Amino acid sequence: MKTILSNQTVDIPENVDITLKGRTVIVKGPRGTLRRDFNHINVELSLLGKKKKRLRVDKWWGNRKELATVRTICSHVQNMIKGVTLGFRYKMRSVYAHFPINVVIQENGSLVEIRNFLGEKYIRRVRMRTGVACSVSQAQKDELILEGNDIELVSNSAALIQQATTVKNKDIRKFLDGIYVSEKGTVQQPDE
C-alpha cells in the first residue's frame, strides 16, 4: 500500500540559520556550520513561515521503507541543530586489571597514542575525525573527553579508540581491558 503524502516538520531555534541548496542542508549556529547531503533520498525539503523557522520534509507516494526516511532526515537535522548550538561530548574511561593503559594526546588533540595496553610494547595510534578534539580529563583519572559539533564524527572517533584496544587471542570475558565510552552528552548544558 502506498501513502499519498507523509510529512514532518523540524522547528528551528532563534540562533540557528538553515539554508537549502537542492537536497543539501546547511546549518549555521553559534558553534559553527554543518552541512549534509540528502541527494540519495527522494524527498522534498522546504522552509516554512515568513522567518523560515521550520523545515518540512515531504514524501509523496512512498512505501514503508521510503516513508521511514522522512523521520530519519528530521532526526539528522535535529542532531545538526543540537551540534551547532550545544555541541557533543563523549567521555571515555580506561579499564585495566594489571597493566595501566597510558594515553597521550598529540597534534593538538587530533591524534591519540595508546601505550602499555596489556603490557604490549606496540604503540596504537588513532587519528580523530576532522572537527573532533580529544583531551585528557583533569578532574577524573584515566578519562578521555571527545568534543565536536557533528555527532557522527564524535561517535565514530570514540568507536575508533574503542576498537584500537580490542583484545586478540584471549578470553574477552576475563580480559576486559580497553577504553570504553562511559558518558554521552553535550558540551554546553541546555537551558531548561
UniProtKB/Swiss-Prot annotation:
SUPFAM superfamilies in alphabetical order: Ribosomal protein L6 (SSF56053)
Main location: cytoplasm
Keyword Cytoplasm on entry: yes
Residue stretches in coiled coil: none
This protein's record includes keyword Nucleotide-binding: no
InterPro entries reported for this sequence: Ribosomal_uL6-like (IPR000702), Ribosomal_uL6-like_a/b-dom_sf (IPR036789), Ribosomal_uL6_a/b-dom (IPR020040), Ribosomal_uL6_CS2 (IPR002359)
GO MF terms held by the record: rRNA binding; structural constituent of ribosome
Gene3D superfamilies noted in UniProt: Ribosomal protein L6, alpha-beta domain (3.90.930.12)
UniProt superkingdom: Eukaryota
Residue(s) carrying N6-acetyllysine: K121
Compartments where located: Cytoplasm
GO BP of this protein: cellular response to nerve growth factor stimulus; cytoplasmic translation
GO cellular component assignments: cytoplasm; cytosolic large ribosomal subunit; cytosolic ribosome; synapse
Keywords, ordered alphabetically: Acetylation, Cytoplasm, Ribonucleoprotein, Ribosomal protein
Purpose: Component of the large ribosomal subunit. The ribosome is a large ribonucleoprotein complex responsible for the synthesis of proteins in the cell.
Subunit structure of this chain's protein: Component of the large ribosomal subunit.
UniProt record similarity statement: Belongs to the universal ribosomal protein uL6 family.
The protein's name: Large ribosomal subunit protein uL6
Organism encoding this protein: Rattus norvegicus (Rat)
Top-level taxonomy: Eukaryota, Metazoa, Chordata, Craniata, Vertebrata
